């Protein structure tokens, strides 16, 4: 893995709004914490979702925007489909994409193909056999319809052979897919713990040597590498010894780097109403982490953005769990050249 002193995007990218539309989910994966999903929360109404979209419109101004809907599981809420149709029909500067477990009712496949630019399906081996079959059937249908599609196969340490089989099937079908290790290597999360809802969770999996060997061989990597690649598949360049070159696996220790996360991302948690620059890093200005504000008082959000519009975010995190694919640099002078 190459050590970089700066990251840049060779191609322009739209601002990405990741919108967690609600906690409710039809899966209950042990590696997904209670703060991310449940099976009891009431779905948010169409009116609530439209109000949030009006905030997104105001926040993004005249920019071209990608909205990626996440959850929970977005497709279990009927109001989600109403919102998607409304945006697709009436708002031309927004492109829609969907991150889903893939177990939607087959009647919704045509809606997805019509209203969405692309879909990322996460295959979860812990799901019920009926739901997993539905997921694979839906994946094949979308592939046949020609929509942009990628499948993240969540490589469950206890169901590794099943996950390998799914990868082989997707490869044979010519469907873009990524075997994804579960977790980011957090030592404290590799064991079981009691979550806030009383459930047993294990959010980082500890793979044995044979599993690790299969993973790197499947990716065509001759020796294990630390770091991450972009989960959205973006092309990324790194500055290595003062020269720019394409990079894949990136060292994710950016603490103290100047970062443009606020210019490329916005995250909305519909369940809590909290709004962040980015879902996982939650970086703010002045070396802090936290929320921009809440949907119940968007005036405060706009006041914060206006007060900090000329300031640079300095990464406060020891590790970048996502967001490594946006312009950033160790040197503030190099960073200014990237913008």
Annotate each predicted stretch with a short phrase.
Residues 6-48:
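Canonical Radical SAM [4Fe-4S] cluster-binding loop centered on the CxxxCxxC motif
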